[in-house]
Amino acid sequence: MSVFVTTLQAVLALLGIGLLGFWIIGRRRVPSDTLAFLQSLAIDIALPLLVVANLISGFSPQVYPDWWRMPLWWLGFAIVALALSLSASFLVRKEIRSEFTISLFYQNGLFLPILIIGGLFGQDNPYLVPLFLFVIFHPSVVFSTYTLFFGKRIQKEKLNWRRIVNPVLVATVVGLIIGLVSANEYIPEFLITIVTMVGAIATPLIMLILGGNIYNDFMYKEDNNKRWYIREVVTFVVIKNIVFPLVFLALLLLLRPDLTIALIVIIQAAVPPITAIPIFVERCGGNRKIASQFVVASFIFSILSIPAVIYLFNRFFPIPF
């Protein structure tokens, strides 16, 4: 049970920071427009530097000889997740099938796993580098494919290459090259300190932003429309937070990869959707309200479901804390 408690404490610590962001925006301590600046600071600067800092300090082909397999594991994960999402979409009405499917498929593959792994093992751990390699293409795929879920409901959009070739992708490639050629030995210590210190603000900043975004998306409605999609939301939470992790755990037991790969895969399967889902849905002319309810309900339920999944996972893949 200690694994459950340890994971629960890590999730609750993250929740506390998220609630602080929720409270700050809800009480108007700062304008909600400030979130746009903080989001840019976190995603375009702090998070890429966090990636670079970990790759510079922790990656080398000697330590991770099979590093190139991580993107392939992600591809396999994405294929299975897409198949599950499309299959489960027939459980809901056709009018909301696109919103249901996209929310199932696009997991919060980078932010929450960073926070969960950091909460469980501290910032200096052997799992962050494989995580960054695992999700190297994930943000690019999200930004280049989300319109496909809505088919003829939207006009064809031009690809935004700034989102596809995003700062996290660039940072991962740069850090990977530095590690492969052992150039980190020639980087001045003060530059590594700067990169590490700025990257360290990414974790709390991301949770503050998540809390603020949830308030803006869920609590503040100009049209005062309070419709709740209880049946659809319950169905979504059961599939996303329970069925997905159990299916992937069964596959892990069948394939028996090493602990690092297995842990990253099960965390990817257990986390809720990315918080940008309501924005994607609205941009595609879908039902933003139900998408917001999917995201928030999954986040709330994950407070208990993630520790439970990690506890069950630990029974088959013992985690060295």
Q: Language-model segments: which ranges?
A:
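Alpha-helical transmembrane segments of multi-pass small-molecule/ion transporters
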Residues: M1-F321
